[in-house]
Amino acid sequence: MMYSAIASKYALALYNISKTNGKTETYKELLNILGDIYNLASVYLNNQAIKPENRVQFVLNIMKELKIEYDEIFRKFINLLIVNKRLKYINQIISFFDYTILEDKGLIPVNVTSAMELSKEEEEILSKFVEKYTNRKPVFNVTVDDSLIAGVVVEFAGKTLDVTVKGRLQNIARNILNREG
């Protein structure tokens, strides 16, 4: 996944504070809740006709109703996102925060899209490949997409490896069109 510079700065700032305060998992959960609130109420939260302090209070009221406890630092973080019109980046902030946690532990997130569920043996082969390439232990996020026909698409460290039948067919079609054009 690509992250905006804005999202990565906010995520990294919160991560550094969370690590210092020993609240990384707490802030991770709070970010996910904030993301859910944003996804459900984005029209209201992005409405610039509503004062920022009212939008902040709206989020805090929802968290209070859900009996979600947060500290002053996270309250200020919410305020900062809304006042600076950055709440729209919350999903990227969450992803980068999660990525930073894994990276700090010496792990690497790997997105795998497969035509069918991976067997343990296939997962082990992919694990060894990624580990050899990055010198870090992979953490897989596997998605099944039967439109791939067969094979896998592996995404990690900004690279994409497509070894699917669908991908090969698209390459063949592209090559034929390029020759004819």
Swiss-Prot record:
**Any one of the GO CC terms:** proton-transporting ATP synthase complex
Major site of localization recorded for this protein: membrane
Localization per Swiss-Prot or TrEMBL: Cell inner membrane
Coiled coil start-end: none
In its keyword annotation, does this UniProt entry include Cell membrane? yes
As one GO molecular function, the record gives: proton-transporting ATP synthase activity, rotational mechanism
Keywords for the protein's UniProt record, in alphabetical order? ATP synthesis, Cell inner membrane, Cell membrane, CF(1), Hydrogen ion transport, Ion transport, Membrane, Transport
The family database entries (Gene3D superfamilies) matched by this protein are listed as: N-terminal domain of the delta subunit of the F1F0-ATP synthase
How would you describe this protein's topology in the membrane?
Answer: Peripheral membrane protein
> What does the subunit section of this Swiss-Prot or TrEMBL entry state?
F-type ATPases have 2 components, F(1) - the catalytic core - and F(0) - the membrane proton channel. F(1) has five subunits: alpha(3), beta(3), gamma(1), delta(1), epsilon(1). F(0) has three main subunits: a(1), b(2) and c(10-14). The alpha and beta chains form an alternating ring which encloses part of the gamma chain. F(1) is attached to F(0) by a central stalk formed by the gamma and epsilon chains, while a peripheral stalk is formed by the delta and b chains.
Family that this chain belongs to: Belongs to the ATPase delta chain family.
Q: What does this protein do?
A: F(1)F(0) ATP synthase produces ATP from ADP in the presence of a proton or sodium gradient. F-type ATPases consist of two structural domains, F(1) containing the extramembraneous catalytic core and F(0) containing the membrane proton channel, linked together by a central stalk and a peripheral stalk. During catalysis, ATP synthesis in the catalytic domain of F(1) is coupled via a rotary mechanism of the central stalk subunits to proton translocation. This protein is part of the stalk that links CF(0) to CF(1). It either transmits conformational changes from CF(0) to CF(1) or is implicated in proton conduction.
Designated name of the protein: ATP synthase subunit delta
UniProt source species: Fervidobacterium nodosum (strain ATCC 35602 / DSM 5306 / Rt17-B1)
Q: Quick one: which gene encodes this? A: atpH
